[in-house]
Amino acid sequence: MRAIGHGTHGKHRLTCAVYRQHFLLILLVVLAEKYYLCQPENICAKVNGFCKPLPLFKDYLQYGYYPYYMENQRDYYTTMEQVSNFVIETELPQLCGVDAGNTRKIKALLGILATSVPFEVDISKLSALIGVHRNTTLEYLADLGRADLLNLLYADLVSVKKMQKPDKIYLENPNMIYALASNPVKIGTVWETFAVNQLKYGHTVEYGKQTGDFRIDGKIIFEVGGADKTFKQIANIPDSYILADDIEYPYGHKLPLWLVGFMY
């Protein structure tokens, strides 16, 4: 799992600080993709033998992604906003050739997406909201993806073309949702954002459309949900799994969502 898991309450502070380190000691020995899908019971038993992952995972989703949380916990979200603004106002013009006069529109675009994610893309609507041409909106989305502020998903990466609109958009990590969204946070969005964020390292992630939420490496289907999530949406689909929050152990093809954070 990227960055540092860290709790919001004093009693969890030490445990959360060593959350990732404990897991890595275990997973360096036993974890690879084939173990995750074929022997998840053994991995979960080892992890749960060291700590209770669920409360730590809940903290991680809100606060644990960036290590500067350790430096200033009270102003963590404010710092995240400042970093995002720096990337848009300074780095995008310098590194991507974005016109500095248009950074206000890019920030507006990010703000719209933060309120709407996961966003099934209507480029014409987005373009109208920020007052730019369709192709300019696509360029801005690509820039925000390269800047690790967004994750852009396509239904078919093999045939994707230049300037093709993404099929679904997520903020880059779940902490950004809590920091930037103006509406109440939907936990299902947080779960999906976490899954995309973690699975994209070392794997291709495609939007599943009618076959689950995500297709991984062109073959494995993941549907994301809570502990009571059923297989209705992925019934009879080969190599399909549910990634469920609020469970410590796997049940058949229903796997703990938190375990995805250690696949790379």
What are these regions (language model features)?
Residues 18-178:
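Interdomain hinge/linker elements that couple catalytic modules in large macromolecular machines
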